[in-house]
Amino acid sequence: MIEANHDRLSGALDGVRVLDVAEPLGVLVSRILGDLGADVIKIEPPGGDPSRNLSPFVTLEEERLSLPFVRANVNKRSVILDLDRRDDQQRFRALAEQSDIVVSTEGIAAWAARGIDLDRLSIFYPHLVWLSFSTFGLLGPYSSYTGNNIVAEAMGGLSYIQGDDAKPPCVSPCEQGVYLASIQAAFGALMALWERRSSGQGQLVEASVHEVLANLYFLLVNYGLWSDIPYRIGASNFMPPNGYYPCKDGYVFIAALMPHLWEKLVDVVGDPRLQDEALRDAEYRNEHPERVDPILREFTARFDRWTLMETLQRHGVPAAPWSTVADVASNAHLNERGFFIEFEQPLFGKLRNAGPMFRATASPLRIRRPAPQPGEHQQEVLAEAVSQVKREPLPAVAGARRGLPLAGVRVLDLSRAWAGPYGTRYLADFGADVIKVESAQFADPREPGNPGYGEVNRNKRPITLNFQTAEGRELLKRLVAISDVVVENFSPRVMAKYEID
């Protein structure tokens, strides 16, 4: 692949302005939009954003820097406004008139007290996408409740399935619930922004951490079909081999659920006890883990974790070593791909951090500016508020009616199993024509009768192609040619094998 000169390329949201009034729950939402190229203006209260006080800190003489704050607030400019004062409310409204998206974590009453009626945004701010991001949403019996990541994970059912069944539930580390919901919220704002291209109008978008987490892991669909309430499996293996196995210096994770992966693992281990025909059945292995796990533990205990990972991967078995944070920071693969980035943080010098969440060759995500000091950009932003004209609604496309934002977009879905189909389902839910291509030779491990299959493949049109024939490959190329988006989760060599590079 030819590497582009990223310094000369614009971001996907170049020219889009975002007002960030999302302290501290929603700061990652606007960070995502900033990474995509948007001009994000962070509105901080007098005294600064409370998330500046989140530990851990880097301390230099009398100054201290919150690392979580830096992580969530690069690519932003900072302005101090007291939104309880009338003059600053007017300044905020002037900025809103010149912005495309507002990201807020406060409710209807708080904004009404400041003279902004969220029910009448389309009248006073017809161009604006207003994203409300909160624990429980704008309306409903819990909408006024105080919430955070732990509260949302408990209420959304995520904590219930985490941990050991004999012990209390566990919360996920590093506020994963809020992180996941932030990605969903940013996606919602992008969908509204895309819809504005045809309708010319903005809209109010709600994203609730509670609802995002309640939508995970097929919990509701399984309960709706079978009244199934899962138990917490802790570190035990579900459908072995699928879990951590001990090594000389730690653990390795092995995931060989599908039949061809099981066969490869059996060949590598070379133990005749695993060659029993009954063990080819994943359900049987799940019911009799004592016939699998002890043998695998004997095998894995002979190796160090990195050697075992390389051995298994060389034979096509998915495996990864248990990694400490130090292991991740020194990981050869991440470093060679340039995943880690360094940027200059005022007062503290050079910081090393994780890079953007995905790569785009023509509109790369990148760090354009460090996390700001409180009010660092006060004068320039307020001067822009005076000098710039307010943004008007865009002219609507002739004959366009408001509807699903991705209507008219065609997506060719070649992905299998979980991650790919789940992603394309979101595109289908928002109106894209998603054509799901399956192969008779390599059936999706989630069978059509499985509720998980239906959950990730709703709103799609399925077809079957035989990629092993010239006719099948030609049909695949024709489908690629008439699609706007192609999604696949094959290993890197597969698409080239089908003559699509």
Language model segments and positions:
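N-terminal helix-loop segment corresponding to the beta1-alpha1 unit
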Residues: 1-198, 373, 377-501
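Short, well-structured beta-strand/strand-turn elements
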Residues: 40, 313-327, 388-390, 434
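Glycine-rich beta-alpha junction loops
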Residues: 47, 135-137, 209-214, 249-251, ...
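Short Gly/Pro-enriched turn/cap motifs at secondary-structure boundaries
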Residues: 69, 232-237, 242-243, 256, ...
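Conserved Rossmann-fold dehydrogenase catalytic segment
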Residues: 138, 167-176, 197-211, 231-237, ...
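Oxidoreductase and adenylate-handling cofactor-binding alpha/beta cores
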Residues: 182-203, 215, 219-225, 266-273
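Aromatic-enriched alpha-helical interface/lid elements that frame and gate functional surfaces
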Residues: 240-315, 319, 326, 399-402
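A glycine-rich dinucleotide-binding beta-alpha-beta segment and adjacent secondary-structure elements
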Residues: 315-368
